[in-house]
Structures are given as structure tokens and as C-alpha cells.
């Protein structure tokens, strides 16, 4: 009871400016003789006290005086009031104002402020430390913002990537479905023999043959716009484009076959003489004249882009689509395409198996036949030059006389026949019985000899160019 009263008194005194309650309680506990076995004044000095048995001190005395049993907390309290440990070997503490028998000196002992005080407000930090902390906070805020932006971009990229992956998966699935359908269709179609046969035929067909059938081209040198085709040449208005069309028609894969039909044997005499006599020779044919067949030939020419061959009747030009791929003929194949077309109305034996040379004998070699034909053309060229000179002289002397024009027109077709003495050309160029009426009818159409000769001369120039092109193709 006395300890409790002393504690209350010390608390009251401390509250009025006296010693602290902790100091008063500690003094009474040390000064009590009943506790000398646990805690007492030091034997060497009255200015210190010793805790002899600290386990019992914490278990029995601390709860009675300080309401706790923590010995470490009691030591910290002593340190706050300036007590120090004197002997490291035992728990002995001393203070200059804590002396035995001098209780009044306790008021001089004051509690020291702790190093880390919790009573300071946040604004009490120094300015330099506060600036450092603010900079650190700002830096961390920027890093946080950057991380959030990177995270948002990553989420956007991930979303776009997922969309692309889904689209790719859909496309792959569609491709697989199409492939499955194609395989099923091919399996079903392969069971159809007609479909397989068509595929085999398409594979065997060459693109060259397909182009040859699909392209629509006219024969080089043919003029389908002139009404009087019986008395004019096939070179009249298309001679300027014959070279280009011939080059387009000739193909490398058909050069061997077309060479026989486009032999460089066409000369100006063939163009002039044969074109002027084309209408006369219709009556010389042993089969007679067939105007129905001639009309059919003229109507069919613009529609057939393939090669033309002589009909077996010998009176008209008949189109043959299969001639493009048929084997080359032996005799008339040596003649040019233009010559064959021009002489289509003549009475020729198309089925001859051999050619005729200059002496009327057969020629087995096509090269020798072509050479002989070129020699005959040179002879006719010379006759054409003579005919041109004579016509020019007659036109200069009697330019204003209609009778002179008629005489020149009548002499023009007869000049080559007097010069040519070759048996090969006699069958085409020699006058035959029964042609006088046809000649009179055709002479009425050739009133302007000068115009015809100029057109024939232009046709000759273009035919020579065609012949040179064909010779280059042969090489």
C-alpha cells in the first residue's frame, strides 16, 4: 500500500513540476529493504543501484510498480532519463541526481528527446531532402505513365495480331475446302471417258495449230472490193499491204509447206499478161465456162483466210480449208500463191505428179523445178520491158487519138505471146480457139491503158519485194 501511495504521490508531484513518476517509482523500489534480494543500492557507492535477479525482477516487481513485465522496456526508460550502465558484468545503473537519501534531487533529472520523434509534422523536413523526395516521386510517376502506355500498345498489337491470325485461319480453311471440292470434282470427272478424251485431245493439240484456226486473215495481194475481178489483177489495191500480210501469214512451223505455194516465180509478165487473159481463158477450158462456180469463188474468198488451191474442174477458184495441213502438191505447189490464184480459171491438170521443164520433160526434184521457173520469169521480164517501151512510144506519139489508144490496148496482151516460146508457158499464154468473143468483151473494159500499166507496174514492184521476202524465208 505504501508503494502505491508513493506512486500516486510521485505522479501528482510530477504533474505539478516535480520529478517524473517513473523516477519516483524506481527510487521507492530500490530504497525498499524488502526488495534488496532482487534490487538494491550498490555496495560500493550510494549513487547507483544493481538488479541482482532480473528474471524475478521482471516477474514480480515490474508488474507491481509499472504494470508490465518487460525488462528491456525498463532499460530503455532508464536510458531516456540519462541513466547509464556502469559495470558490463552486471545490471548496475547510475545517474548523478539519483542518490540514496536525497530524493529531492530527482527533479533535476529530465527525459531526453528521442532521435526519431513522431511528434514532428511532415512539413518539418529540410528543403533539400524534400526536393530529393519530390524529384524521386516525379520520376516514378513518369515511369509509371510510360509503363501504362507500353502496356496499352501491347494490348492493341495483341488484338490486331489475333484478328490477323483469325483471318488467316479462315482463309486457310477456305483454301482447304476449295481444294477438297476440286479433288472431288476431278475424281468424278476422271470417271467420265468423254471428259478424259477431250483432255487428251487438248493436250495433243499444239498452240500453233490453234492460232492458225482462230486467226482470220486475208490472202496477201487479193482485192475483194473491186467488182470486175475477171479483168483486173489480184494485186490492184492490196499490193501495198501484201508484204506485211505475207509476213504475218508465213509461220516458221509452216515454212516448208507454204514455200511450195509461195515460190518466188511471180513476175510482172505473170501479173499483166495473165490478169488480162484471165477472162479469155475461161472459154478455152475443155469443160467450158461455169459462171456459177466463178461467182461462188468470188463470194467465198473474203471468208476463207486459208490457202487457196486450184479446183479439179480447172475453171474457178475454190477455197480449201484442209490445204493448210495437207501434204504439199508436187507440180503446182512450185508455183506461187499469186500465180495459182490468177490462173485458177485456166484449164490446168491439177493432179499432175511431176513438173515440166523448159523442154516439156518431167522434173522430179522440186528445187530444179523452182530454178527452171525462175529462168522462165526472167525471160518474161524482158518481154515485159519491151512491151512497156512500145506502149510508152505509142502513147507519146498518139496521145490525142482514140484509135491509137485502142491499138495499144489491142497490142498489149499479144506481145508476150510472140516472145515466149516455152512449152511450159504455151499452155497458159497461147491463144486458143473460142476466145475472140471474150477478148472483145474484155477489150472494151480496158479503155485507159496508161492507168492499167501504172497499176501493173506498182503491182510488179510489190511482187518483187514479196519474192525477195519469200527467198529469205526459204534460206
Swiss-Prot record:
Entries under InterPro entries matching the protein: HSF_DNA-bd, WH-like_DNA-bd_sf, WH_DNA-bd_sf
Coiled coil regions, renumbered to chain: 129-202
Matching SMART domains: HSF
Gene Ontology CC terms: cytoplasm; nucleus
Motif (Nuclear localization signal): 214-218
Location(s), subcellular: Cytoplasm; Nucleus
Residue ranges, compositional bias (Basic and acidic residues): 374-396, 448-475
Record's compositionally biased regions (Polar residues): 357-370
Motif (Nuclear export signal): 339-343
PTM comment: Exhibits temperature-dependent phosphorylation.
Main location: cytoplasm
One record GO biological process: cellular response to heat
Biased composition (Low complexity): 397-415
Chain segments carrying region Disordered: 357-415, 430-475
Segments for region (Hydrophobic repeat HR-A/B): 140-190
Keyword annotations of the record: Coiled coil, Cytoplasm, DNA-binding, Nucleus, Phosphoprotein, Stress response, Transcription, Transcription regulation
Gene3D superfamilies membership: Winged helix-like DNA-binding domain superfamily/Winged helix DNA-binding domain (1.10.10.10)
PROSITE patterns with a match to the protein in the record: HSF_DOMAIN
Motif (AHA): 422-431
A GO term for molecular function: sequence-specific DNA binding
Assembly information from the UniProt record: Homotrimer.
PANTHER family per record: HEAT SHOCK TRANSCRIPTION FACTOR, HEAT STRESS TRANSCRIPTION FACTOR A-5
Comment, domains: The hydrophobic-rich region (HR-A/B) corresponds to the oligomerization domain. AHA motifs are transcriptional activator elements.
Role summary: Transcriptional regulator that specifically binds DNA of heat shock promoter elements (HSE).
Family: Belongs to the HSF family. Class A subfamily.
Name assigned to this protein: Heat stress transcription factor A-5
Upper classification of the organism: Eukaryota, Viridiplantae, Streptophyta, Embryophyta, Tracheophyta
